Amino acid sequence: MINYLKSFFLYEIVRGLTLTLKYFFKPKVTINYPYEKSPVSPRFKGEHALRRYENGEERCIACKLCEAVCPAQAIVIESDERDDGSRRTTRYDIDMTKCIYCGLCQEACPVDAIVEGPNFEFASLTHTALIYDKERLLYNGDKWEQELTNKLHKDYQYR
């Protein structure tokens, strides 16, 4: 009998509407994404970048540790030996469609040449635009150098 009266007076609907009205006047939890951005952790792993030294020389010494440690095999490196006996890369490609953003390349690098930056907005309509060559990676490093330095400084205590 009680169940019949509850269904007759639409008890469930009234209960649902009171719950809706209760949350209607509370502050919103969601973020209006393109116009508002949530804070990003200093340990966030985003778009890759190659860094340079202060004198403008690239940091990568072509040890190929990042290529060896990459579980997705997204990194391809070719190198040449210079006149002074050191090696530098002639080709450094990362296929961002294969990358799983694990950060192992960054951890394996002995000179902090390859890092994952704060940028996560790099969507593209074509597959070829997501295959980053050395120039694109160096451009990202130059563009994000200050933020990358701050990020590495904050993360240094955990390394």
Swiss-Prot record:
> Main site of residence?
membrane
Query: Where, by residue number, does [4Fe-4S] cluster 2 bind?
Result: C70, C99, C102, C105
Record membrane topology: Peripheral membrane protein
Any one Gene Ontology molecular-function term assigned to this protein's record:
iron ion binding
* Top-rank EC class of the record's enzyme: translocase
Q: Describe the task this protein carries out.
A: NDH-1 shuttles electrons from NADH, via FMN and iron-sulfur (Fe-S) centers, to quinones in the respiratory chain. The immediate electron acceptor for the enzyme in this species is believed to be ubiquinone. Couples the redox reaction to proton translocation (for every two electrons transferred, four hydrogen ions are translocated across the cytoplasmic membrane), and thus conserves the redox energy in a proton gradient.
This protein is called what? NADH-quinone oxidoreductase subunit I
